[in-house]
Amino acid sequence: MASYKPVVIPAVPKLGEKITQDTLYWRGYKTPVQIKEFGAINKIDFSPVPPYNYAVTASSRVHIYGRYSQEPIKTFSRFKDAAYCATYRDDGKLLVAGSEEGSIRLFDISGRAPLRQFDGHTKAVHVVGFLSDKYRIFSGGDDYSSSLWDIPSATEIVSYSEHSDYVRCGCASKLNGDVFITGSYDHTVKVFDARTKSSVMTIEHGHPVESVLLFPSGGLLVSAGGRYVKVWDVLKGGQLLVSLKNHHKTVTCLCLNSSGQRLLSGSLDRHVKIYSTTSYKVVHSFNYATSILSLALSPEDETIIVGMTNGVLNVKHRKPEESKEKSQKKRQPAYRTYVKGRNYMPKQEDFFVSKPGRCIMRKYDKLLKSFQSSKALDAVLEPHIRLYTPEVTVAVMQELNRRGTLRSALAGRDEKQISLLLTFVTRRVIEPRFTPVLITVADMITDIYQPVVGQSALVDKQFLRLQEAIGREIDYQEELLEVLGMMDALFATLTEKRATYLEENKSNGLTKTLDQDISI
């Protein structure tokens, strides 16, 4: 008796992933380290100076982590309620943070108690940072105002009340010590100059603005809000250069790499997209477990950190590059390895014993082996098979048809099972690789259950959907045939013109070949 041969699942060729230099570069990070914080992480900021520690703002604390440490090396907890947007100064010596109660606190990295406290906002302060002159602080709060503060005197210099909704993001120019930018939920981005009493530029983003970023050159501004990341030319009065829509949910954070050639964006859709700042196309993407609130890249691009809504801090360090001198060469096999067994001469009385390989059969193969056609069809109609590997379902249907038992496997089913079959056929019949088999299945289902049509509203609805799907496919085929007819006419006309042109050249004694003819 011949052994059972498992059902052959036709393999469909897959397109290989395009490997680029960016792909190789961004894959060069180690397995991430997970650090659990006390709450959602709203801000991550790297110190601009070595050893590049980073500040993490979560819940009512600001933790300072060493670059490779998994435990905080310092904690600032002098907040009555939630803390927001802890940011380093350019020299890495001071840290400023906003709070839910509306006050702003300035900390010395070497101490624990706040050096200064700035009071003036009446509601939560979600954005705070240093101007590039190092002696002033800008802030924005839920009271719709943006303020400028003097560090030595701990007083408010000027306050702007131009936004009509919460101010949730901001940044300062690195070239001009008087310029800072704020973004608000009123869909606008405003550019302020400390020397003026009002904003100098207003940009309409179109969605609540979650993050803004100014290029180091000061000429380009990036805003994120809704599903959009937009790039603006500040030197041309806020002209829109490009609008990127590569996320499926709200974009919450932005970041630039050290060279300014790559822009990173994080979103609630759990993705970090990396764009080229020349073509503004996505060159790589990272996937994470939950929604992303904050994102930071170390000054040397050696560490990428993502903060998520569940309070998890995801830290990826770059793999060290191995020098060619230190890399050990693989040991070459000994000579006896190559000549082993070459001098053996088989004898006539030798017995050759072949060990049969163990074949693990799937559930549907076991049922087919025992000729249980109906149960085999039920096995491949399970959700995890019909939804994710429909080629297995179709292959079993094809095998049942080859055996002549497909009709008996389809017969004798209740309303729910018939509806499931029709749903699968309707969804997959338009795929060319499944069409021949599923047309046969559809014909058999129609023949078997035609007498009961009209007795079940659910089955009737599925039959109508199948009819609509087949009708649409027939219309597509007719349109394609029309296009093929047009193309045949064009090719025929082109062939006639070339033949006429060639005859004219021959009659004139020209020796030009058809490959050198002018394009028609």
UniProtKB/Swiss-Prot annotation:
CDD domains: WD40
PROSITE patterns listed in its UniProt record: WD_REPEATS_1, WD_REPEATS_2, WD_REPEATS_REGION
SMART domains referenced in this protein's UniProt entry, alphabetically: WD40
Highest rank taxon of the organism: Eukaryota
Name of a matching Pfam family: UTP15_C
GO cellular component, one term: small-subunit processome
Subcellular compartments: Nucleus, Nucleolus
Database matches in Gene3D superfamilies: YVTN repeat-like/Quinoprotein amine dehydrogenase
Keyword annotations of the record: Nucleus, Repeat, rRNA processing, WD repeat
Entry keyword annotation includes rRNA processing: yes
Keyword Endoplasmic reticulum annotated: no
Xref: InterPro entries: U3_snoRNA-assocProt_15_C, WD40/YVTN_repeat-like_dom_sf, WD40_repeat_CS, WD40_repeat_dom_sf, WD40_rpt
Stretches forming WD repeats: 36-75, 78-117, 120-159, 162-202, 204-242, 246-285, 287-326
GO biological process: positive regulation of transcription by RNA polymerase I; ribosomal small subunit biogenesis; rRNA processing
Free-text function comment from the UniProt entry: Ribosome biogenesis factor. Involved in nucleolar processing of pre-18S ribosomal RNA. Required for optimal pre-ribosomal RNA transcription by RNA polymerase I. Part of the small subunit (SSU) processome, first precursor of the small eukaryotic ribosomal subunit. During the assembly of the SSU processome in the nucleolus, many ribosome biogenesis factors, an RNA chaperone and ribosomal proteins associate with the nascent pre-rRNA and work in concert to generate RNA folding, modifications, rearrangements and cleavage as well as targeted degradation of pre-ribosomal RNA by the RNA exosome.
Subunit structure: Part of the small subunit (SSU) processome, composed of more than 70 proteins and the RNA chaperone small nucleolar RNA (snoRNA) U3. May be a component of the proposed t-UTP subcomplex of the ribosomal small subunit (SSU) processome.
Name used for this protein in its record: U3 small nucleolar RNA-associated protein 15 homolog
Gene: UTP15
